[in-house]
Curated annotation (Swiss-Prot):
Species the sequence originates in: Streptococcus mutans serotype c (strain ATCC 700610 / UA159)
Chief location bin: cytoplasm
NCBIfam families the UniProt entry points to: adk, PRK00279.1-2, PRK00279.1-3, PRK00279.1-4, PRK14527.1
UniProt pathway: Purine metabolism; AMP biosynthesis via salvage pathway; AMP from ADP: step 1/1
Protein origin, superkingdom: Bacteria
Stretches the record annotates as NMP: 30-59
Free-text comment about domains: Consists of three domains, a large central CORE domain and two small peripheral domains, NMPbind and LID, which undergo movements during catalysis. The LID domain closes over the site of phosphoryl transfer upon ATP binding. Assembling and dissambling the active center during each catalytic cycle provides an effective means to prevent ATP hydrolysis.
Protein name as annotated: Adenylate kinase
Location within or outside the cell: Cytoplasm
A single cellular component GO annotation: cytoplasm
Gene3D superfamilies named among the record's database cross-references: P-loop containing nucleotide triphosphate hydrolases
Residue segments, region LID: 127-159
EC numbers: 2.7.4.3
Function: Catalyzes the reversible transfer of the terminal phosphate group between ATP and AMP. Plays an important role in cellular energy homeostasis and in adenine nucleotide metabolism.
C-alpha cells in the first residue's frame, strides 16, 4: 500500500503518520529525514543537495525529485509500501512523482487529507504561551497554567494569530491545487481532523483497511 498524507500545519499530520506507520508497517518517508539520510549516505543526489544547502540556496526541484526517486528505489519499499509525508509540495512535483512511480513500476493507492477548519487551526497554533521565568510551554485553551497571569507569559512572534493565519494562507494556496489534482484521480480520502486524535486514526484505519 502506497500513500501520501497531507494536511495544514497543526492538523495532526505527524501524529497520524506515526500511527499509520505503526499499524500498517509502511516505510515512513518524510522529506526532512529523506534529505538527511541522502546527505549522510553521500548518495549522488544527497551530495548535490548538500552543495545547495551549504551555500544557503534552495534545493531545486530536480534534485528533490531525484532524492525521492533514490528513496523509492530502495528494497524496503516493494516489501512494505510507503507513506510519503511532505512531498509533493507543488503541482510540478506531483507530475514528477507520477513519472517516478511509473518508472519504478509502483502506484499510488490513496491520499489521506486531514481536513481541519483553518479557524480552528489558528486557535490551536496561536494559543501557545511560554512562562518568562521557567520557559515552560502552555496553551491558553488546551493546557492553561493553573496560575495564569498575563504578565508572566509571552508569545513567540511566529505563534501570534496574524502570523499563524498568514502561514496557513500560504499553505492553503500551495496545497489546494495538489489535493484537487489527486482528487480528480479519485485518490483523496478527506478525514475530519477536528476531533479526538484516536477518533481521527480510527477513521483513517477504516479507509486503509478497505485499500489494503
Amino acid at each position: 500500500m502506497n500513500l501520501l498524507i497531507m494536511g495544514l500545519p497543526g492538523a495532526g499530520k505527524g501524529t497520524q503518520a506515526a500511527k499509520i506507520v505503526e499499524k500498517f508497517g509502511l516505510a515512513h518517508i518524510s522529506t526532512g529525514d529523506m534529505f538527511r539520510a541522502a546527505m549522510a549516505n553521500q548518495t549522488e543526489m544527497g551530495t548535490l543537495a548538500k552543495s545547495f544547502i551549504d551555500k544557503g540556496e534552495l534545493v531545486p526541484d530536480e534534485v528533490t525529485n531525484g532524492i525521492v526517486k533514490e528513496r523509492l528505489s530502495e528494497s524496503d519499499i516493494t516489501k512494505k509500501g510507503f507513506l510519503l509525508d511532505g512531498y509533493p509540495r507543488t503541482i510540478e512535483q506531483a507530475h514528477a512523482l507520477d513519472e517516478i512511480l511509473s518508472k519504478l513500476n509502483l502506484k499510488l493507492d490513496g491520499v489521506i487529507n486531514i481536513d481541519v477548519d483553518p479557524a480552528c487551526l489558528v486557535e490551536r497554533l496561536s494559543g501557545r504561551i511560554i512562562n518568562r521565568k521557567t520557559g515552560e510551554t502552555y496553551h491558553k485553551v488546551f493546557n492553561p497554567p493553573a496560575d495564569y497571569n498575563e504578565d508572566d507569559y509571552y508569545q513567540r512572534e511566529d505563534d501570534k494569530p496574524e502570523t499563524v493565519k498568514r502561514r496557513l494562507d500560504v499553505n492553503i494556496a500551495q496545497g489546494h491545487p495538489i489535493i484537487e489534482y489527486y482528487r480528480n484521480k479519485g485518490l483523496v480520502y478527506d478525514i475530519e481532523g477536528n476531533q479526538d486524535i484516536n477518533l481521527v486514526f480510527e477513521t483513517i484505519a477504516k479507509v486503509l483497511a478497505n485499500l489494503s
